[in-house]
């Protein structure tokens, strides 16, 4: 969860920063869901990983052009310091390997692009498993969430000359998809079932 997001050195304008204390919305959803499941399923083997940071401006803040090493040793070129949430999620996804999961679910208020594409009522979700997608579509909530494609061809937008991957594409296109593709690169093993839910659609509500 990003407890407050200024955008870092790629600073957000004031009107975009006003309610960025809500950028921990994905973490809040994950914690609430975890507590509900643990309460009703006493023998549940569910595990919760919450990476936490504040994205601020300081003398040691990450800078555009920096190269960071992730938990799985992949290197990441920082092209935009306001694409920080995916850096936290990347390490959390890799760390999930410690629990040998059959399914990984992540929640994040990750991209404005998801809300631009689907509006304020439909969170986008991505999955590498059609079986998982079928289960989502079979629920009563299937009309309230929308599957988006993991279009692998867009990985070319994430290429770096100095690192394994960039943290954000520079052309501004397909921002939600490229963010999901970035996360996919940090799954602990390729065959693990995974679903990424971009909850930024809901973030416009001041009640959140």
Please give the residue ranges for each predicted region:
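A generic structural signal for tightly packed, nonpolar segments enriched in small/aliphatic residues
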Residues: 1-208
């Amino acid at each position: 969860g990003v407890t407050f997001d200024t955008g870092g050195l790629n600073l957000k304008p004031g009107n975009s920063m006003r309610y960025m204390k809500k950028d921990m919305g994905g973490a809040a959803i994950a914690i609430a869901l975890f507590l509900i499941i643990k309460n009703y399923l006493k023998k549940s083997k569910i595990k919760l990983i919450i990476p936490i940071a504040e994205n601020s401006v300081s003398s040691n803040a990450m800078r555009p052009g920096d190269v960071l090493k992730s938990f799985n040793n992949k290197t990441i070129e920082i092209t935009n310091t306001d694409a920080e949430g995916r850096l936290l999620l990347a390490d959390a996804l890799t760390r999930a390997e410690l629990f040998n999961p059959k399914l990984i679910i992540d929640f994040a208020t990750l991209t404005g692009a998801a809300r631009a594409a689907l509006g304020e009522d439909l969170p986008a979700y991505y999955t590498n498993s059609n079986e998982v997608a079928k289960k989502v579509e079979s629920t009563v909530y299937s009309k309230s969430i929308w599957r988006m494609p993991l279009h692998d061809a867009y990985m070319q937008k994430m290429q770096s000359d100095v690192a394994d991957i960039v943290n954000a594409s520079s052309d501004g296109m397909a921002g939600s998809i490229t963010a999901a593709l970035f996360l996919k690169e940090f799954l602990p093993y390729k065959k693990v079932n995974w679903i990424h839910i971009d909850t930024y659609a809901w973030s416009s509500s001041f009640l959140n």
